[in-house]
Structure formats: structure tokens, C-alpha cells
């Protein structure tokens, strides 16, 4: 219900604003999505799916002296009961903004780096996009002509389990209509 959603978003923002060095908020938002989709294809598949998705988002501004930094946190769940709590989202957004304070620019150099989970997921999104059939067909992929070539170091592995249920991106069947 709308009132409960507003209360959760306000709680998230309030908890975040109570943290040290958090100067302001770009807002907190709770959104809920519900849809019903019907799929049909030439393989004889006709299926109706009911989907829900719930998101809680908080964006903050941290300030120390004259320096200001922004950061955000969010939670996503298919079931509203599994959504990350307002407290956890607010506190994590505050922590991320606070951690950026005092950051500095480095001179260009070659050195080992460590990516945060958020950064690494963005890199994998780019990789998966480059592997997509449509980009290969349109010849717009930076991995064009990479068939049978390693595109990641041997130390990196990608795991996919299409049979998981109740996970983001899960489907009851693939694009060819093959049921899981």
C-alpha cells in the first residue's frame, strides 16, 4: 500500500540522515512493480507469467569541511517480504558516502586494482552485452571475432544456473520455449 511504501522510504532516509557527516539526501524511494506477460512463439509456446519486483533506493550527500561526496545503496527483491530493510539500505548508503570523503586522485599508473562488487557487476554487464547475439550480428561488439578465444583470464570464472527459481532474471522457460 502507498502509505506503507512512503513510511519505509522515509524511515530509510531518516536513518541515513542521522549518521555522521551525512549532510543531505537526494532522496529515498520505494517502488513496486507488478506485471503479467504472455509469451508465444513459433515453437508452440504459449505461456502467461506473473512478475513482481520491489526496489528500495537511497542516495546521500556526505560532507567534510568543503568536500562533498555522493553515494547510493539499494535493495531489490521479487517478493516484498525479502526486500532489504530500510535500516540496512540507509546505513549502507551513509557508509558508502562517508568512505568517499578524503578520497584523492592518483596519477596515471599501472598497478593491481580491486573492484567492489558493484563495480565488478558493471564490468560483467559490459562483457555479457558484448557477447550478446544482437551485438555480434550488428558487428558492434568489442569481442567481435572472439569465437573460441579466451576473453577472461583463467582465474576468472562465470557461473550461470538457469534453473534457479525466484531470482532476478529467472524465467520459467528460455527464448526458444524450452521449459526449465
Across the structure, where does each feature detected by a protein language model lie?
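Cation-handling catalytic/transport regions enriched in His/Asp/Glu
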Residues: 180
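Active-site bordering "gate/hinge" segments
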Residues: 1-171, 175-177
Amino acid at each position: 500500500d502507498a502509505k506503507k511504501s512512503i513510511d519505509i522510504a522515509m524511515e530509510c532516509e531518516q536513518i541515513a540522515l542521522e549518521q555522521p557527516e551525512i549532510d543531505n539526501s537526494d532522496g529515498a524511494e520505494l517502488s513496486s512493480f507488478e506485471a503479467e506477460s504472455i509469451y508465444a512463439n513459433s515453437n508452440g509456446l504459449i505461456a502467461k507469467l506473473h512478475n513482481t519486483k520491489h526496489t528500495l533506493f537511497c542516495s546521500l550527500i556526505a560532507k567534510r569541511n568543503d568536500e562533498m561526496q555522493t553515494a547510493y545503496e539499494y535493495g531489490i527483491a521479487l517478493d516484498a517480504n525479502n526486500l532489504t530493510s530500510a535500516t540496512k539500505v540507509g546505513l549502507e548508503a551513509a557508509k558508502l558516502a562517508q568512505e568517499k570523503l578524503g578520497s584523492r586522485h592518483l596519477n596515471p599508473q599501472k598497478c593491481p586494482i580491486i573492484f567492489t562488487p558493484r563495480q565488478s557487476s558493471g564490468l560483467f554487464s559490459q562483457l555479457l552485452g558484448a557477447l550478446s547475439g544482437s551485438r555480434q550480428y550488428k558487428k558492434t561488439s568489442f569481442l567481435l571475432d572472439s569465437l573460441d578465444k579466451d576473453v577472461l583470464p583463467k582465474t576468472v570464472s562465470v557461473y550461470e544456473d538457469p534453473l534457479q527459481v525466484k531470482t532476478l532474471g529467472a524465467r520459467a522457460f528460455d527464448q526458444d520455449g524450452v521449459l526449465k
